[in-house]
């Protein structure tokens, strides 16, 4: 199959790991990401993609001109765009996709677009004889008879969770996925969002769990059956699991869903090795000890390794509503200083945005499994 040259659009901080680990996308989709364009307000033309997330260098230069970048590609990879209905870049995105159709570029999405956009682009793509589709990967349908009890999962499970959501987990997961595959292991990857499907994995079935009109018990049994189906379908050597959502509350207003998906996961399967990412904040050792206790006894996810991300969660900015949480992204130098502070307190912690960390975690997993 011919490898198509792809333009990833729009590129924002959250999906930079797709550029950093673009070989995973090429291996799964036969799409080589050769261009990426961010919204104009980002001012990243000519900069390395790592400028957006302050992570390790990607050796991938960003473009600020959608039309020129599109001209060098065969298709558009449409990145997940939150809140289509009131995105400040909505009209710009729609205009660029229309231009792509007119230039006979295929368009591939992470998920179905909200209406009326999805129906509109389906019709528009058909008019110009181009493909407009959602890249999905599903496991075989569940056998309803398997919801009678919890079945054992025999494949080792390596889980990555975040103290807060969007705390460096996604990049860490892709780094671990690449490292495990390079060492020759068959890995079934379950990621926290639809991007997992671009790298040969599956999206965590959060939508299915949220729509189940039943008790926690049924949700837990459903998730267990889902993992059992995955194990039987792929017969992997290891399951790499990215748990969606956070695990610890930010404050009394922002509770990170009270660790909802972490709780369901810990009840549904036995995790063999757990990595917890934390924000770039100087916590007291006593607080981190309490977090470990909570992970072990509240979620049944004993923490084997802590990883420091380069993201800091800032206090809510709306005094009345107390609902908006902002995030700062720090350089490797700032993260290094924070690492030194933790070492002075004898807190063992790894740096999430670091290739050495991926190899270190894999070695620790091997050692634990014996």
Regions found by a protein language model. Name each.
Residues 1-134, 307-329, 340-351, 367-370:
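Long, basic/Gly/Ser/Thr-rich N-terminal segments
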Residues 3, 73, 185, 234-239, ...:
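Short, high-confidence coil segments that cap the C-terminus of an alpha-helix
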Residues 25, 62-70, 222-234, 262-264:
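Short amphipathic alpha-helices and their capping/turn segments at secondary-structure boundaries
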Residues 108-112, 160-167, 213-214:
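Flexible, glycine/proline-enriched loop segments at strand-loop-helix junctions
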Residues 109-127, 222-225, 243-343:
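Conserved catalytic-core segment of NTP-binding enzymes
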Residues 143-190, 288:
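Walker A (P-loop) phosphate-binding motif
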Residues 157, 175-217, 292-297:
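N-terminal phosphate/diphosphate-binding loop that engages ATP/GTP or pyrophosphate donors
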Residues 199-248:
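Conserved nucleotide-sensing/catalytic segment adjacent to the nucleotide-binding pocket
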